[in-house]
Amino acid sequence: RGVAIVGVGLRLPGGVDDLESLWDTLIRQVDTLRPIPPERYDMASLYDPDPDARGRSYVKHASLLDDVASFDASFFGISPREAAPMDPQHRLLLEAGWTALEDAGIPPDTLKGTTTGVFIGMGPNEYGQHRGRTPGDVDAYDVTGSQMSFAAGRLAYHLGLQGPALSVDTACSSSLVAMQLATEAIRAGKCEVALAAGVQVLANPQAMVLLSQTRAVAPDGRS
């Protein structure tokens, strides 16, 4: 059974938000690497070029999205209270998923009640730590807005889908695994259409510090 990619939604570093801008970035060999800004997290106090320095990171550059917190919550029927603790990864999935359907020429409302599936490859939630919430501050929206398990369900719920919806974290291969699962589901007849996505937002320095301890990242931040 043949499977085709019919639409794409992108949110990538360097202002890339469609295939045309992605192609332009590649052709012009645009370098999207930049110093991690303090509004993302305070990398300056954690940086140390010595890879053996405990509790420090020898990386201070990354390719990052601009204005990652920007989100039109009302467009998706989400209240300000619910949107505030929502992991930017959830927000990006909603936006990119909607864009992918538009790019495919599929009116989103025509998928309501169908067996369309949602398959998400997602990085860990760092936004909760970034916000610095305490147990006394949290409410139900801190749970629904932060857990990886809710990410695929949120997109499926918004579109009224009845197909399989799941999120996976297989580290660097998460996006490819999501695409493979979507392909298998279509070929098995579990769904006619599938949204497959990958998302990761660096919002807390802890992962960078831990990866530096294992020397799993390049000093220049490129891999």
At which residue positions do the language-model features occur?
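Cys-dependent condensing catalytic cores that perform Claisen condensation/acyl-transfer
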Residues: 1-223
